[in-house]
């Protein structure tokens, strides 16, 4: 008896079972005009895996909700006050999530266009390649990117990379509201059936256009399982070398962007220690505005809610905790596609249908023709070398002048070379011709030529490499002409001072007796320009704008 009472007590302590949200409804219930569960059309919709864009066409019929016996499945939506809603026969395992939204901004650092595409494709939960011939076998020193390679965010990153040297900072907020998936053999949409019937029996060069027309309408894959809710994704492009010249790093700016995003959605107070640290950094670097206003080259995507897809809820002018709350409150009735699983379109055909294999080949061919290739054999610029960690990346030796990203550490730096020295009509001795030599000074360095004996019109073949100097503050470029005697009593015949500027210059200086001529070449370091190399100069990748394998590469 005591044992029974003990077991009864344990049973009463157990949590009450949560009722299943969906049930089989009677015919009379099914006749009532209930709405479908939110976002139900996204499962079964087509998608192009190279662009990650939904096609807007539906190979699967997600509108049918009545079974042959006229019953249906109805669900209680706890996120919409237990509203009763229909579930199509093509959908199963529908569940609302109780966690709603967490006010947290996830941050990530990305260093290449390929990395941006990879991040975009990370929302695919399964292996989309299964059953397709899409595993690139690139030639030596080539790297392929397929999924997401033509997505909007990857195109944004590619265009930036061809303008300048960039790092990318990603800030993301996600909310998950619902999840569901297609049944094992979902009913096909009538229009898709018609499109399949119109396809030629085989895929070859003469039928390629017909198959690609279907792919352009429906995509390469269809969505089989979804997590719906909302996502705000902001990718900020940061000019790597401009940051270095401003005394900042991409990590420092990225961290402060994340702090400002946290404040904008109410996840962090503006009195937090992190926020105060970023405010102090702004003062140190004399920034007049916020980090997100200073660094505003960005790509924004907002999924879910009634707002426009480019409305920036993290860094926009109206980005406030109240605006974020309004957006999250709209997600139960207007969810977006957060995560998903994909299957190739050809798997919807019966295995014995010969067009199944033809469509598989067509999809594989289309995807591979869209692959973007990174040319890792592309030569590095002068002074750079291939990274030991990544053969596709170039880097520099860390030094006082440049960092490992090959960025100059300060403005005004140039490589200075002085050469082509000659003099005319010198007069250094009374009884013989001049025994002339030169001294050349700049930035605390001194070079000296050899003596040209007994010649009033001497030439020197010396090439004086001052290497990397501060052009604007190194002082004048000074060339002195001397007449050699015994060393202690050498005579200074004249001096020539010039303030060097970038470019190639020929100089003629008049002396008391005769003249001296020379030339100098001052080449601004990469990412610097202007007369004294004080201005910033964007410097992108070598070659043409991004394209596919038949054109340019990343």
UniProtKB/Swiss-Prot annotation:
The annotated topology with respect to the bilayer is: Multi-pass membrane protein
Keywords from the UniProt entry: Calcium, Cell membrane, Cytolysis, Disulfide bond, EGF-like domain, Endosome, Glycoprotein, Lysosome, Membrane, Metal-binding, Secreted, Signal, Transmembrane, Transmembrane beta strand
Q: Where does Ca(2+) 3 bind?
A: 429, 435, 483-485
| Consequence when changing residue 491 to N | Decreased calcium-binding
GO MF terms on file?
calcium ion binding; identical protein binding; pore-forming activity; wide pore channel activity
Q: Which domain of life is it from?
A: Eukaryota
Q: Which InterPro entries match?
A: C2_dom, C2_domain_sf, MACPF, MACPF_CS, Perforin-1_C2, Perforin-1_pore-forming
- Note on domains (UniProt): Perforin consists of three domains: (1) the MACPF domain, which includes the central machinery of pore formation, (2) the EGF-like domain, which forms a 'shelf-like' assembly connecting the MACPF and C2 domains, and (3) the C2 domain, which mediates calcium-dependent binding to lipid membranes.
Record-stated family: Belongs to the complement C6/C7/C8/C9 family.
State the name under which the record lists this protein. Answer: Perforin-1
Q: Which organism is it from?
A: Mus musculus (Mouse)
The protein's gene is named Prf1
């Amino acid at each position: 008896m005591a044992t029974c009472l003990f077991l009864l007590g344990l049973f009463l302590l157990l949590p009450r079972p949560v009722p299943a949200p969906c049930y089989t409804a009677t015919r009379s219930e099914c006749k009532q005009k209930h709405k479908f569960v939110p976002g139900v059309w996204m499962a079964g919709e087509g998608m192009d895996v190279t662009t990650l864009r939904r096609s807007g066409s539906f190979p699967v019929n997600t509108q049918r909700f009545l079974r042959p016996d006229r019953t249906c499945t109805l669900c209680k939506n706890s996120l919409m006050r237990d509203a009763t809603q229909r579930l199509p026969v093509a959908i199963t395992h529908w569940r609302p999530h109780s966690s709603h939204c967490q006010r947290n901004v996830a941050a990530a650092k990305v260093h290449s266009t390929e990395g941006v595409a990879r991040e975009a494709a990370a929302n695919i939960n399964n292996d989309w390649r299964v059953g397709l011939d899409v595993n690139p076998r690139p030639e030596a020193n080539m790297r392929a990117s397929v999924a997401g390679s033509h997505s909007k965010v990857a195109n944004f990153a590619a265009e930036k990379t061809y303008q300048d040297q960039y790092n990318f900072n990603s800030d993301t907020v996600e909310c998950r509201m619902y999840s569901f998936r297609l049944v094992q053999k979902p009913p096909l949409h009538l229009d898709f059936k018609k499109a399949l019937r119109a396809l030629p029996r085989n895929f070859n060069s003469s039928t390629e256009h017909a198959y690609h027309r279907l792919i352009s309408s429906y995509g390469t894959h269809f969505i089989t399982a979804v997590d719906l809710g909302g996502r705000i994704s902001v990718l900020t492009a940061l000019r790597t070398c401009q940051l270095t010249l401003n005394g900042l790093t991409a990590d420092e700016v990225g961290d402060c962007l994340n702090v400002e995003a946290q404040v904008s959605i109410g996840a962090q107070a503006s009195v937090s220690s992190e926020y105060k640290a970023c405010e102090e950094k702004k003062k140190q670097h004399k920034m007049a505005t916020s980090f997100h206003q200073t660094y505003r080259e960005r790509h924004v995507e907002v999924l879910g809610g009634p707002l426009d897809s480019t409305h920036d809820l993290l860094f926009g002018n109206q980005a406030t905790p109240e605006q974020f709350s309004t957006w999250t409150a709209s997600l139960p009735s207007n969810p977006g596609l957060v995560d998903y699983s994909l299957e190739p379109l050809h798997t919807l055909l019966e295995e014995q249908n010969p067009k199944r294999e033809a469509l598989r080949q067509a999809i594989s061919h289309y995807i591979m023709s869209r692959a973007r290739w990174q040319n890792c054999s592309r030569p590095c610029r002068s002074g750079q070398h291939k990274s030991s960690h990544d053969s596709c990346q170039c880097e520099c030796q860390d030094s006082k002048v440049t960092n490992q990203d090959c960025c100059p550490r300060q403005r005004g730096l140039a490589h200075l070379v002085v050469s082509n020295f000659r003099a005319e009509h010198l007069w250094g001795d009374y009884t013989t011709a001049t025994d002339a030599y030169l001294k050349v000074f700049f930035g605390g360095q001194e070079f000296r030529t050899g003596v040209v004996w007994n010649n009033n019109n001497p030439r020197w073949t010396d090439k004086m490499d001052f290497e990397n100097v501060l052009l604007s503050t190194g002082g004048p470029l000074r060339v002195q002409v001397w007449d050699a005697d015994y060393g202690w009593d050498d005579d200074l015949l004249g001096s020539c001072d010039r303030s060097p500027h970038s470019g190639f210059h020929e100089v003629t200086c008049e002396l008391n007796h005769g003249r001296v001529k020379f030339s100098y070449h001052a080449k601004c370091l990469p990412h610097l320009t202007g007369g004294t190399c004080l201005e910033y100069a964007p410097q992108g990748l070598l070659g043409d704008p991004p394209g596919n394998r038949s054109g340019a590469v990343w």
